[in-house]
């Protein structure tokens, strides 16, 4: 083994060792067990075994000597046998605890521990002794201390054995003789059991007593001794409240019984009991010791022991080291005895001398380590006494022995030094700073706050004053602003803003809040949060008074307020411990403890000032982040300095316990700047006060009962004790506390108040600030119920208005008076003008005069009972200042009396008689004696203390050779782990190579040391930005990482430059520089800051200068000059976003228009963009690609980037682009315009459409358009949040421009038209024809201008009004028609937009979003998709043009306060949109109409994200899909977006005749407004034009219906019918101009007749379409087609080709014409019909050709009409028209063929047909065709539609169409590519090939002529 480095440190003088040894005590029980353990553990260690063997022999021989006690008779001292087999042969533990055994065993244990330690350190006992500075022993431990002191180094182990033998002999005889001399116990068994049951243990001769001080214990002992009992002795003083009593067991039991009646239970709450009156928490415990050591009871022992030891001698000069013990009542070093024998002294020190253990321990006060060799917990006793001296106890006995022996062999620092409180926490002198003439005092508090060590506490009302607080701060002291005196948000905010403007920029504010007022605290914390986080007020800390919140609440405040320190005012030991729990939970946050104890002014505890700190000091100092401040009772230098240097505790027998600062409170109330009324100041100065130096047993505590020193303690409104001056008012308060407010029973209180009513009222009126309210005109007290309205008014004014100063005490009192007048008005009023006048009066004279004028004698009416209650409620009203009077004696009397009782001390003028004796004046009983002068300036008060302290400090430093100045920096090693260093002259480089690095704080501390500017730049959390505080961006940016390089450059030995070079280790050369942060300290107080990054091959830089601010002490703080800094940032971003070669936009205004470059979209650029965006997302999505020329919608932002960012750089915005947050971005294609394609050339224009200023900054919205050939293609809208408000010196212009949604008004009544025309803002372009029945479309935009407070100031609304196409009432309005007028309105001071309000009430948006009734599509399996955020942002930055370095450079992102680089919001947006594009399968990028992402949180590279999709609405035929993106790890939403998607290509098909049925469409009619509107309009048209109820026909299907022509309207209807039949009288057979009616008949019901089936079907289908449109599901550009009749329905529903009513008339005409085209029998039936045929049901290979052949054969065989007229579904569905006989044959032939084995054979078909020809001859038009296997008759169809039979009627129908179809109504864009006509089956077109196709099918001669002209013009 190598020598111990620890002992090397001892030899070098770095450590000083002492030894201590234990004695009798609880360890007596286990002494032998430990001996056995050590004997076995060191069985192979010869020196240890030799000691055990020799000791065992000695003890065995001594026990064999005959003795008068006969103790060892029959049992002896067989130690060796016990060591070999203790279980079998050793005595019982209770016997071993007896002194004859325990005394030598304990001595041997200590010797053995010492020997083992020496052996382990490779020393002999003498060599170990040579390392010691001295030794002490607790009781018998002094024998071992003396033994090791005589162990010579020259003789090694033998010398030690001889010394051990001496110690054992002494121990044996003292133990035996003491046991024999002890008084015998006379306790009976029950008395012993009593002690055991009370937890006191088995009675013995020593009793441990803890919890009492020495004075109490001595009084108790004297009392018991005086009662004539056996003698009791205080034998050992183990600590400040730890004692041992010696005596006979029955005498000691008497002590136990006496203490049982006076001691307190540990669970008893005595926090409200003044500490001198508290019952002590006492613990008593008998010790297992069989003799009353250290008492006169053993006075006979010394002679007997000396006789027994015979010729043994020990001289003082035999001791090689000091050994301390008690001798003759004092502490002695036994070496001082010289040649005299000290054995008798040693014996007496154990038997009769009292042990003063603290005195023994203080003999080792220069120790660094005390080696405790036991037995028992003697080391703990040393630790208790010497804690705080820098000493550390090393326990080398018991269970900790082995581990501590190992530590002794490790290193010199393995055993840490204890804290030397006096040196570590005492004030230090800091040498004079530059610009200062004097040195200053430094403590933990001064280092934190940068102010002197004396501060001013938060006090209500004194430090509620911004002026006083500002004066203290300007005097360069720390003070707390008291929030407790503010009752609403507005006044607190105003005061704090005023204060922040009044203090130096480098100083900050600490706010004091009251935890016991939870309601006020809640809103005050919210106010502070807003002022700190949103306005940047320099509020750095809070102090919490009147309670300790939970750690969870504190965490919430820390996170919410971003405070730099938090202070608490604990009132007890338990509260201190709760603060320490908080401090341990937040070890990096400075936590202040302001200890004031019970002597504080104002609210106070009942604690002594000193005792709790003595108890808690060690625990407090174990939390390095705790700052300890002493308050209460202070006011000068002499009384405070002992608490600063810690000497106060030395007087009490403790180590020095310095505080970090001094807190002054009520002392400041007499300061000149305090608002305390002068009369109050005089009373304070006159109060004598009391002293409290810790030795007067708390004289101030008597304030609880009566005035002491002019101060008394009363119970405040919060129910807490409060110290106040003993004015008449406060003596009354105290009296009422005792007499009335202490009564808890409401009935008893009521009775007491009633009994003493007169006395109470008189005392209030004579002595208190709040007089009795109700009094008569002759000033006689009465009750409110007896007052008149006039008397109430007069008394209110008298008590709330300060007449001689012509002011209301508080503005809320004027409101109270006005509210009472309103109450009176409600009772007495008549609504006269005079009544209204008094509500505008503001003085009592005016108010009373107006009241008299209004009511005269009525005012003398006594208050109505209801009004009494209302008046009391007004007095109680929350939010107003509590009333300054007592209105009644009721259950709330204490509240009336005490509420809001502190303000009067600052406004005696508002008190009755201006009598200061009537008010509550906060003062402390001790502190008040220091206030001797009124109106002393705060600076003089505070400087007087600190300057005197400085003189005292300089004097102490001059006499202390070991004193260290604060400026002296401890030398540190030059190396930090993980960092390589190189030096080149004055340049030092640090290469951060890893693999691990020290913390940033450690690196910064190593770099800057005592460099003030470096500390300000790299360590200060805040900087001054403009006039407010902001996080220090340099500190945030300076976070060195592995691979980085730091350069430090020095000049004249001073740090001048610091540069951090950032490199990316994963990208090649570790020295490759990606960015840099450079700091240069310029001459004077300037610091230059440079940030470099790399972008597009350039190195754009941010360069600016900062100013150093600060006083002559404490840390400096940097100030960023806002204008210069923002100019620098704008230059950087101009370079990044726009380019140096382009003109800067900073000089133009907020209303300017900005343009981007002219850009041609190339496939290469788009593909590069897609490649970058496609790198993130699920694997399948990354592998997926799109095609086609359409440009992705996200790329529009890339094109528009320059135009979108130019406005941000406006100087007028006063914005910091580094603090820019992208809130949202909306991109949408202009409807109806071809989207962007590759190859398009576009330009961009933009402008600011919103600029609003909030408490946290600005919200700026920029709108832009991409224009192709001058026309908008894409519209963009992006919103930025710019943190930090603009300065008041720049433009505060706020506005919002809104493109309102197109609004539609249906002018469906004359009333609505008149209302519209009455609006002044509705301006027609010229005379307009009747607008009734028309639809107006409003396309408007609004501009709102806001005032400085953000409230709307003016509104401008303008835009155009257009007439919708005539048919748009049927379907949703999808197009805009002709302009007919405009809207223009300007208005100031408005609440809402009146134009939009009108349009919303009378109209609706043109495009309405329709929520889905149930959750829609969620992407199926892709409803929740996980993916990884982009791994890097450089690629996106390059392709997008957004080269903002916060996305790519850690230095810049940290500088901006964002931490690590943030993924571009638009990069994430493009990634998410592409994933959605993949999910919907939009391969050609055509389905996105708009994309609007909003960004909710920051996303870092490689974050795991989850994407959720929900289709939740439809809008104008498009799907509206909501997308959420969340972080997988936390569930935090980081983005949400809305996509408007075209549906997959949809075709709308309308059915034809044959599908009608009774009641069709009526279910929808009953449930859907849009469908009902269509039916109702059709109904109105048919009734008005044709006298028919279409709804009746549909609902009832009548077989006949008569239209009467008798009336005038009936004749008009007849004329309409006649005009329809002019060209074809067969249409309405029998109708003439003389017809008085006309009846329609049809046997199957009119709904089955063609004439009514066709319009009914058309209306039903258009209604269905309108329903779909109202749900927003109709695709606006969808393809549509109609089957036969359905073609009319499709054109009516999907186009504006014809007005709805005209279309219905056309279809009715068509139906009538077809209905009567063919002859009918008497029952109205024709010979024709139609069937649907499905050839596949005959056989699967029966094809279309076979069906056509079959139809031809049937027609041929029957000789009548049969044709295939509709080709619906290939090989599946066809419709055949023909004669009923041929249809019958076809149906039966199909049935036969389906059973045939060869149905395709022509022969088989002919045979089947032939088989049915004979039977068909009996088929007539009355025969009902039945359904066959392959055929279905079309019910109600008896016309062979689409057959050759009807061709002869085409010309007539063509003429009708030409007459009714207007070319002007036809819009080709509604038809081309969308309509699929029946005749072609191909989408409609207007090109020549399509015309040729139509002409070929129809043989149209006009089309043939058109084609000829086209050919000629080519």
From Swiss-Prot:
Residues 1398-1532 form the MaoC-like domain. It catalyses: acetyl-CoA + n malonyl-CoA + 2n NADPH + 4n H(+) = a long-chain-acyl-CoA + n CoA + n CO2 + 2n NADP(+); holo-[ACP] + acetyl-CoA = acetyl-[ACP] + CoA; holo-[ACP] + malonyl-CoA = malonyl-[ACP] + CoA; a (3R)-hydroxyacyl-[ACP] = a (2E)-enoyl-[ACP] + H2O. GO terms for biological process: long-chain fatty acid biosynthetic process; sterigmatocystin biosynthetic process. Pathway: Mycotoxin biosynthesis; sterigmatocystin biosynthesis. Residues 1548-1900 are annotated as: Malonyl/palmitoyl transferase (MT/PT) domain. GO terms for molecular function: (3R)-hydroxyacyl-[acyl-carrier-protein] dehydratase activity; [acyl-carrier-protein] S-acetyltransferase activity; [acyl-carrier-protein] S-malonyltransferase activity; enoyl-[acyl-carrier-protein] reductase (NADH) activity; fatty acid synthase activity; hydrolase activity. Keywords: Hydrolase, Lyase, Multifunctional enzyme, NAD, NADP, Oxidoreductase, Phosphoprotein, Transferase. Pfam families: Acyl_transf_1, Fas1-AflB-like_hel, FAS1_DH_region, FAS1_thioest_ins, FAS_meander, MaoC_dehydratas, SAT. Residues 17-395 are annotated as: Acetyltransferase (AT) domain. This is Fatty acid synthase beta subunit stcK. It comes from Emericella nidulans (strain FGSC A4 / ATCC 38163 / CBS 112.46 / NRRL 194 / M139) (Aspergillus nidulans).
């Amino acid at each position: 083994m190598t020598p111990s480095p620890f002992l090397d440190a001892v030899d070098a003088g770095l450590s000083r060792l002492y030894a201590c040894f234990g004695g009798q005590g609880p360890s007596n029980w286990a002494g032998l067990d430990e001996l056995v353990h050590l004997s076995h553990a060191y069985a192979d260690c010869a020196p240890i075994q030799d000691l055990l063997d020799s000791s065992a022999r000695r003890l065995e021989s001594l026990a064999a000597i005959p003795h008068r006690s006969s103790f060892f008779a029959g049992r002896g001292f067989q130690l060796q046998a016990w060591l070999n087999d203790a279980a079998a042969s050793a005595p019982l533990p209770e016997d071993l605890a007896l002194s004859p055994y325990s005394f030598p065993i304990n001595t041997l244990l200590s010797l053995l521990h010492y020997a083992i330690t020496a052996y382990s350190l490779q020393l002999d006992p003498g060599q170990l002794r040579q390392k010691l500075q001295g030794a002490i022993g607790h009781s018998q431990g002094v024998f071992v201390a003396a033994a090791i002191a005589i162990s010579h180094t020259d003789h090694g182990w033998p010398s030690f054995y001889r010394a051990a033998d001496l110690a054992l002999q002494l121990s044996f005889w003292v133990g035996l003789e003491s046991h024999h001399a002890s008084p015998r116990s006379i306790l009976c068994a029950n008395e012993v059991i009593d002690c055991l049951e009370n937890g006191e243990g088995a009675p013995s001769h020593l009793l441990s007593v803890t919890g009492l001080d020495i004075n109490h214990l001595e009084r108790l002992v004297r009392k018991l001794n005086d009662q004539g009992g056996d003698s009791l002795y205080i034998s050992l003083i183990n600590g400040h409240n730890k004692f041992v009593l010696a005596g006979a067991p029955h005498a000691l039991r008497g002590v136990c019984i006496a203490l049982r009646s006076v001691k307190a239970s540990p669970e008893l709450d005595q926090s409200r009991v003044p500490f001198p009156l508290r019952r002590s928490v006492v613990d008593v415990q008998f010790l297992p010791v069989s003799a009353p050591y250290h008492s006169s009871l053993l006075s006979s022992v010394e002679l007997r022991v000396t006789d027994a030891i015979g010729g043994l001698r020990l001289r003082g000069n035999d001791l090689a080291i000091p050994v301390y013990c008690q001798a003759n009542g004092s502490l002695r070093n036994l070496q001082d005895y010289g040649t005299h024998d000290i054995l008798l002294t040693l014996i007496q020190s154990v038997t009769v001398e009292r042990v003063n253990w603290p005195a023994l321990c203080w003999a080792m006060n220069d120790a660094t380590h005390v080696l405790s060799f036991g037995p028992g917990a003697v080391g703990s006793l040393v630790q208790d006494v010497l804690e705080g001296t820098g000493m550390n106890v090393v326990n080398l006995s018991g269970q900790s022995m082995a581990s501590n022996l190992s530590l002794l062999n490790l290193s010199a620092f393995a055993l840490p030094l204890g804290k030397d409180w006096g040196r570590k926490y005492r004030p230090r002198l800091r040498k004079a700073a530059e610009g200062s003439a004097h040195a200053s005092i430094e403590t933990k508090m001064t280092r934190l706050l940068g102010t002197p060590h004396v501060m001013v506490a938060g006090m209500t009302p004194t430090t509620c004053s911004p002026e006083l607080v500002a004066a203290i701060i300007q005097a360069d002291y720390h003070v707390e602003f008291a929030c407790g005196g503010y009752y609403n948000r507005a006044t607190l905010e105003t005061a704090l803003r005023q204060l922040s403007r009044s203090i130096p920029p480098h100083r900050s504010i600490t706010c004091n809040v009251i935890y016991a007022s939870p309601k006020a605290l809640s809103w005050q914390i919210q106010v502070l949060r807003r002022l700190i986080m949103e306005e940047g007020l320099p509020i750095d800390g809070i102090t919490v008074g009147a309670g300790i919140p939970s750690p969870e609440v504190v965490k919430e405040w820390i996170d919410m307020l971003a405070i730099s320190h938090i202070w608490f005012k604990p009132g007890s030991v338990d509260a201190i411990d709760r603060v320490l729990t908080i401090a341990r939970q937040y070890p990096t946050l400075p936590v202040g403890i302001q200890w004031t104890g019970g002597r504080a002014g104002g609210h106070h505890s009942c604690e002594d000032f000193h005792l709790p700190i003595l108890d808690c000091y060690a625990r407090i100092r174990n939390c390095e982040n705790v700052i300890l401040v002493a308050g209460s009772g202070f006011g000068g230098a002499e009384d405070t300095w002992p608490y600063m240097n810690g000497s106060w505790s030395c007087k009490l027998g403790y180590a020095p316990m310095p505080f970090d600062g001094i807190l002054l409170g009520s002392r400041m109330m007499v300061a000149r700047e305090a608002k305390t009324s002068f009369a109050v100041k005089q009373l304070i100065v006159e109060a004598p006060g009391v002293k409290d130096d810790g030795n007067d047993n708390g004289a101030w505590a008597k304030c609880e009962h009566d005035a002491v020193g002019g101060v008394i303690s009363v119970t405040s409104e919060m129910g807490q004790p409060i110290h106040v001056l003993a004015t008449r008012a406060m003596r009354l308060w105290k009296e009422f506390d005792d007499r009335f407010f202490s009564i808890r029973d409401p009935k008893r209180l009521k009775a007491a108040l009633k009994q003493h009513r007169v006395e109470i009222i008189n005392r209030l009126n004579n002595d208190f600030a709040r007089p009795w309210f109700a009094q008569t005109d002759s000033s006689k007290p009465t009750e409110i119920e007896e007052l008149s309205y006039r008397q109430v008014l007069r008394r209110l004014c008298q008590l709330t208005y300060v007449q001689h100063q012509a002011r209301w005490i508080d503005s809320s009192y004027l409101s109270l008076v006005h509210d009472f007048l309103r109450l009176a008005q409600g009772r007495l009023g008549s609504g006269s003008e005079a009544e209204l006048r008094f509500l505008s009066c503001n003085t009592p004279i005016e108010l009373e005069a107006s009241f008299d004028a209004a009511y005269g004698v009525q005012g003398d009416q006594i208050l109505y009972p209801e009004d009494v209650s209302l008046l009391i409620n007004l007095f109680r009203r929350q939010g107003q200042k509590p009333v300054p009077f007592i209105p009644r004696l009721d259950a709330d009397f204490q509240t009336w009396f005490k509420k809001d009782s502190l303000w009067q001390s600052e406004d005696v003028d508002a008190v009755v008689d201006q009598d200061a004796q009537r008010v509550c004046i906060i003062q402390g009983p001790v502190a008040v004696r220091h206030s001797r002068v009124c109106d002393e300036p705060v600076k003089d008060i505070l400087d007087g203390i600190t300057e005197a302290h400085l003189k005292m400090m300089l004097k102490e430093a001059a006499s202390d050779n070991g004193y260290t100045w604060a400026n002296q920096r401890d030398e540190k090693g030059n190396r930090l782990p993980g960092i390589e260093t190189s030096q080149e002259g004055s340049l030092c480089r640090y290469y951060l190579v890893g693999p691990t690095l020290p913390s940033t704080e450690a690196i910064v501390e190593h770099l800057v040391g005592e460099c003030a500017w470096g500390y300000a730049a790299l360590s200060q959390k805040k900087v001054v930005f403009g006039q407010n505080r902001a996080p220090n961006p340099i500190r945030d940016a300076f976070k060195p990482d592995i691979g980085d390089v730091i350069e430090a450059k020095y000049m004249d030995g001073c740090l001048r430059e610091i540069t951090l070079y950032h490199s990316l280790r994963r990208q090649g050369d570790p020295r490759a520089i990606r960015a840099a942060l450079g700091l240069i300290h310029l001459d004077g107080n300037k610091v230059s800051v440079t940030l470099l990054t790399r972008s597009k091959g350039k190195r754009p830089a941010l360069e600016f200068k900062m100013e150093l601010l600060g006083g002559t002490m404490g840390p400096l703080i940097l100030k960023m000059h806002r204008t210069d800094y923002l100019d620098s940032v704008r230059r950087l971003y101009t370079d990044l976003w726009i380019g140096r070669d382009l003109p800067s936009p900073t000089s133009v205004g907020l209303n300017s228009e900005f343009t981007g470059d002219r850009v041609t979209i190339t496939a290469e650029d788009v593909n590069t963009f897609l490649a970058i965006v496609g790198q993130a997302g699920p694997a399948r999505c990354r592998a997926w690609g799109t095609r086609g020329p359409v440009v992705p919608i996200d790329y529009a932002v890339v094109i528009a980037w320059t135009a979108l960012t130019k406005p941000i750089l406006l100087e007028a915005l006063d914005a910091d682009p580094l603090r820019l947050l992208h809130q949202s971005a909306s991109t949408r294609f202009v409807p109806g315009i071809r989207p962007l394609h590759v190859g398009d050339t576009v330009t961009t224009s933009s402008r600011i459409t919103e600029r609003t200023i909030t408490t946290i900054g600005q919200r700026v919205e920029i709108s832009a358009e991409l224009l192709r050939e001058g026309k908008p293609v894409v519209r963009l809208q992006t919103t930025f949040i710019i943190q930090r408000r603009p300065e008041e010196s720049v433009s505060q212009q706020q506005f919002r421009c809104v493109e309102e949604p197109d609004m539609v008004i249906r002018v469906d009544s004359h009333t609505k038209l008149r209302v519209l025309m009455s609006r002044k803002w509705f301006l027609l372009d010229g005379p307009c024809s009747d607008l009734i029945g028309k639809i107006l479309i409003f396309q408007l935009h609004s501009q709102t201008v806001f005032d400085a407070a953000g409230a709307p100031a003016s509104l401008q609304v303008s835009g155009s009004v257009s007439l919708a196409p005539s048919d748009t009432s049927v379907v949703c309005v999808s197009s805009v028609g002709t302009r007919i007028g405009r809207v223009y309105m300007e208005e100031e001071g408005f609440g809402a937009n009146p134009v939009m309000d009108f349009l919303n009430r009378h109209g609706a948006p043109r495009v309405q979003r329709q929520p889905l009734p149930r959750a829609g599509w969620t992407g199926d399996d892709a409803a929740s998709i996980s993916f990884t955020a982009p791994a890097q942002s450089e690629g996106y930055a390059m392709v997008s043009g957004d080269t903002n370095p916060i996305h790519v450079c850690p230095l810049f992102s940290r500088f901006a306060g964002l931490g690590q680089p943030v993924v571009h919001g638009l990069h994430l947006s493009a990634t998410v949109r592409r994933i959605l594009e993949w999910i919907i399968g939009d391969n050609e990028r055509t389905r996105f109409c708009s994309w609007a992402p909003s960004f909710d949180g920051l996303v870092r590279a490689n974050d795991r994200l989850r994407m959720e999709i929900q289709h939740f609405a439809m809008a104008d035929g498009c799907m509206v899909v909501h997308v959420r993106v969340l972080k997988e790890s936390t569930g935090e939403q980081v983005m949400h977006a809305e996509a408007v998607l075209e549906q997959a290509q949809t075709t709308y098909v309308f059915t034809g005749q044959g599908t009608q049925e009774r009641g069709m469409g009526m279910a929808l009619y009953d449930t859907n407004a849009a469908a009902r509107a269509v039916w109702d309009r059709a109904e109105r048209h048919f009734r008005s034009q044709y006298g028919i109820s279409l709804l009746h026909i549909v609902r009832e299907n009548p077989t006949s219906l008569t239209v009467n022509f008798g009336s005038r309207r009936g004749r008009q209807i007849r004329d309409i019918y006649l005009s329809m039949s002019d060209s074809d009288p067969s249409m309405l057979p029998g109708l003439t101009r003389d017809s008085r009616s006309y009846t329609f008949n049809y046997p199957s019901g009119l709904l089955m007749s063609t004439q009514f089936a066709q319009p009914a079907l058309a209306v039903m289908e258009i209604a269905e379409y309108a329903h779909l449109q109202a749900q927003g599901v109709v695709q606006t550009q969808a393809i549509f087609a109609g089957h036969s009749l359905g073609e009319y329905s499709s054109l009516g529903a999907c186009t504006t080709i014809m007005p709805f009513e005209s279309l219905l008339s056309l279809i009715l005409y068509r139906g009538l014409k077809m209905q009567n085209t063919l002859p009918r029998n008497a029952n109205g039936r024709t010979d024709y019909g139609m069937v649907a045929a499905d050839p596949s049901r005959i056989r699967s290979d029966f094809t279309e050709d076979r069906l056509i052949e079959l139809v031809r054969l049937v027609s041929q065989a029957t000789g009548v009409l049969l044709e295939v007229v509709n080709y619906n579904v290939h090989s599946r569905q066809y419709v055949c028209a023909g004669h009923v006989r041929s249809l019958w044959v076809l149906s039966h032939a199909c049935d036969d063929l389906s059973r045939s084995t060869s149905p395709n054979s022509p022969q088989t078909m002919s045979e089947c047909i032939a088989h049915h020809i004979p039977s068909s001859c009996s088929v007539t038009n009355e025969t009902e065709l039945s359904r066959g296997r392959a055929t279905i008759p079309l019910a109600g169809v008896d016309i062979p539609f689409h057959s050759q039979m009807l061709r002869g009627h085409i010309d007539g129908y063509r003429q009708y169409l030409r007459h009714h179809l207007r070319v002007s109504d036809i819009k080709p864009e509604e038809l081309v590519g969308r309509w699929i006509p029946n005749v072609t089956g191909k989408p409609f077109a207007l090109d020549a090939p399509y015309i040729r196709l139509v002409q070929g099918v129809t043989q149209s001669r006009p089309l043939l002529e058109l084609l000829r002209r086209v050919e000629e013009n080519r």
